[in-house]
């Protein structure tokens, strides 16, 4: 709707709906974390007590949650029998069984970002940023969200976007995942391609330790993990393939990191960079689903953690145009951009050296 055509009353109604939706997102987050959504998906119409008992939760809290989920038109309520149900077509978008279609995972970020609201407001007045240490849950949630996509699509959909890559990995290649987190992608690739060698690189000691422990538990001799600051990484011609999953826009020095990636690749090597699907031009993002959410995530996390390190503050919505330009500046001359159906949030950049 154009602002010139919208009345004050229409705007008021639209904003009231936005507030209502924010409340609903929190309820969905609670339903995901408590297992209520998964529990209800497996139940016939049931009372609040029956649902609480099935989920192992306190009935009074469950009943209040059901009230909001009913008025939010996610849960159906039968007043005659005092029973609640979660229709299958909604469960198919809100439960763990939905895999990468599970929108309840994204809903968790609404309350998480609210936890740092006052700290971000202080930065509006004083400058600087909010450091990673203030987000103890963020990386766990990111791992959960990206893990859904990885499990469903990494081996069979994402890697084949790079022409010839699966065959190259089956033959044996040196691969690094920059900003690997706890190593979900490294684990999946190492399991699928035993002839290749995979190195996960991350700034976090905790992430590197978790990845190392998981690789040992699974007996993955072809997966190792190293702690490095990507902006200071000094590897030359070390890898045939480098992957980066939603990590560049958070970097304090993203241009330097891309240059280091280019240097670390061997001639003929390839970078598979996954990052947020958006335009670098604000006007192109107006009316695009989840754009407001992405700008909010940038303000409340991605931009500010970079600024906390005296970084560039690139932000979540740096966009396709800037991304391809920065890849070119780093030395990549052959860059293509792909999309996959199971991931509505990201572009897949394929850059060859």
UniProtKB/Swiss-Prot annotation:
- Quote the InterPro entries the UniProt record gives: Methyltranfer_dom, Rv2258c-like_HTH, SAM-binding_MTase, SAM-dependent_MTases_sf
Cystine pairings recorded for this chain: none
Q: Which SUPFAM superfamilies match?
A: S-adenosyl-L-methionine-dependent methyltransferases (SSF53335)
GO molecular function list: methyltransferase activity
The UniProt keyword set, sorted, is:
Methyltransferase, S-adenosyl-L-methionine, Transferase
In terms of Gene3D superfamilies, this protein maps to: Vaccinia Virus protein VP39
What are its GO biological-process terms?
cellular response to hypoxia; methylation
Family matches, as CDD domains: AdoMet_MTases
Q: Name a GO CC annotation attached to this entry.
A: plasma membrane
EC number of this enzyme: 2.1.1.-
| Domain of life assignment | Bacteria
Record keyword Methyltransferase present:
yes
Any Pfam family hit: Methyltransf_31
List ligand-binding residues for S-adenosyl-L-methionine.
146, 179, 202-203, 229-230, 251
Enzyme class, UniProt record, top EC level: transferase
**What does UniProt say about this protein's domains?**
Consists of two domains which are linked by a long alpha-helix. The N-terminal domain is essential for dimerization and the C-terminal domain has the class I MTase fold.
Give the record's subunit note.
Homodimer. Co-immunoprecipitates with DarG in the presence and absence of darT.
What does this gene product do?
A: Probable methyltransferase that may target bulky nonpolar molecules with aromatic rings.
Give the family per the record.
Belongs to the class I-like SAM-binding methyltransferase superfamily.
Its protein name is: S-adenosylmethionine-dependent methyltransferase Rv2258c
Organism, by scientific name, is Mycobacterium tuberculosis (strain ATCC 25618 / H37Rv)
